[in-house]
C-alpha cells in the first residue's frame, strides 16, 4: 500500500482526474453534476447546487483550463522533476485549502459558494495532501541514504583510552627503574674510588 501511494502514482492520479473533468465538460457535464455521490455530498454540506446546460459555451473554456492544468503537472512528471513538485505542491495545497474555506463560509457570494467549486477544491486539497506527504517521506528517505544514518551496530568501534593510558604508565615506570639503576651504579663506583684512595693514602 505504501509503494502504491508514492509521489509518482499520486501525481499521475491528479493528471488523470483533471483530464477526466475536462473530458466530461465537453461530453456531458451533467454526468458529474447529477452524480449520486455528488448530490449526497452537496446536501450533506448544505450547499447550493450548480446547474449548467451541456451546450453552454463556458464549458469549452473550463475544459481548456483543466487540460492545461493537467499538462502543467504531466510534463515535469515525465521528466522526473522532483524539485518542481517539492516547490509547487505545498503552495498549491495552501491555495486550495483557502479556496475551500472561502467556498463554504462565504455564503453571500454564489460565484464561489456552490457545490461544484467546493467539491473540486476539496478534492484538490485531498490529492495534494497525499502528494505532499509522499514527497516528504521520499525526501527524508533520500536524506537518510545520503548521510548513512542507518549504521549497523557491528560497524561501531568502541574507543580504548584506558589501555593506552596503562601502557604509557608502564613505560614511565620502566624508565624510572632504569634511571634508579644508573644512579646506584654511579654511587657504587664513587664508593670504590674513595676506598682505593684511602688505601693508597695509608700505604
UniProtKB/Swiss-Prot annotation:
Topology Lumenal: residue spans: 25-58, 114
Regions of compositional bias (Acidic residues) in chain numbering: 175-187
Subcellular compartments: Endoplasmic reticulum membrane
GO biological process: mitochondrial genome maintenance
Transmembrane portions of the chain: 4-24, 59-79, 93-113, 115-135
Segments on the Cytoplasmic face: 1-3, 80-92, 136-203
Membrane topology type: Multi-pass membrane protein
Biased composition (Basic and acidic residues): 188-203
GO cellular component labels: endoplasmic reticulum; endoplasmic reticulum membrane
Pfam name, any one: Ilm1
Stretch forming the signal peptide: none
Region span, Disordered: 175-203
Keyword Lipoprotein: no
Keyword terms, alphabetized: Endoplasmic reticulum, Membrane, Transmembrane, Transmembrane helix
Family designation: Belongs to the ILM1 family.
Further details from the record: Present with 1160 molecules/cell in log phase SD medium.
The protein's name in its UniProt record: Protein ILM1
UniProt gene name: ILM1
Amino acid at each position: 500500500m505504501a509503494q502504491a501511494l508514492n509521489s509518482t502514482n499520486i501525481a499521475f492520479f491528479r493528471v488523470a482526474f483533471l483530464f477526466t473533468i475536462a473530458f466530461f465538460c465537453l461530453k456531458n457535464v451533467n454526468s458529474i453534476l447529477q452524480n449520486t455521490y455528488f448530490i449526497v455530498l452537496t446536501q450533506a454540506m448544505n450547499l447550493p447546487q450548480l446547474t449548467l446546460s451541456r451546450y453552454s459555451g463556458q464549458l469549452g473554456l473550463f475544459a481548456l483550463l483543466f487540460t492545461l492544468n493537467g499538462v502543467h503537472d504531466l510534463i515535469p512528471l515525465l521528466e522526473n522533476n522532483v524539485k518542481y513538485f517539492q516547490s509547487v505542491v505545498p503552495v498549491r495545497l495552501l491555495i486550495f485549502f483557502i479556496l475551500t474555506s472561502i467556498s463554504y463560509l462565504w455564503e453571500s457570494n454564489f460565484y464561489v459558494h456552490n457545490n461544484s467549486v467546493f467539491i473540486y477544491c476539496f478534492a484538490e486539497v485531498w490529492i495534494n495532501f497525499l502528494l505532499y506527504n509522499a514527497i516528504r517521506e521520499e525526501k527524508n528517505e533520500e536524506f537518510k541514504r545520503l548521510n548513512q544514518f542507518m549504521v549497523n551496530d557491528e560497524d561501531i568501534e568502541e574507543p580504548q583510552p584506558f589501555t593506552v593510558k596503562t601502557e604509557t604508565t608502564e613505560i614511565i615506570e620502566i624508565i624510572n627503574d632504569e634511571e634508579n639503576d644508573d644512579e646506584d651504579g654511579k654511587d657504587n663506583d664513587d664508593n670504590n674510588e674513595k676506598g682505593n684512595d684511602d688505601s693508597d693514602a695509608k700505604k
